[in-house]
């Protein structure tokens, strides 16, 4: 088991954990000269039915954790884009894209509704962000990282 806000070194692998806004932790993994970020359940889980007090705390907590990634060059990131959140689906992804340098971003937690990716790309007018977001079409899709742009 791992706990939030810790650094673990296992051989040539370094793992830093961030506190989730839901369950578990997010991971920043460095190995073989590459950096991989996996958000887990770290997201700005804004919801209509919970009120501004809880939503405000959620947003502050999310931003606080993401600020810990500033200055990191991330090669591959897995970031939440959950269509169950309706109009708030992309709040976490949008903040991540504006504040973290990541070469390739794979949206996740989409519950097989991959249309949220294209909706975000159409909504976002900054191609520096949208060009880094990978289009996912199906569950368990395989990407050949050696042949990406």
List PLM regions with ranges:
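Binuclear metal-ion centers of metallo-dependent hydrolases, dominated by the metallo-beta-lactamase
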Residues: 1-7, 89-149
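Core dinuclear metal-dependent hydrolase active-site scaffold
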Residues: 1-73, 138-149
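Active-site neighborhood of phospho(di)ester-bond hydrolases with catalytic His/Asp-centered motifs
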Residues: 37-41, 57, 76-84, 104-111, ...
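A sequence-composition feature that detects small, non-aromatic residues
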Residues: 23-26, 39, 77, 94, ...
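A short, acidic, amphipathic alpha-helical segment used as a generic capping/interface helix at domain edges
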Residues: 61-67, 86-95
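Active-site environment of divalent metal-dependent phosphoester hydrolases
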Residues: 23-25, 44-48, 83-89, 108-118
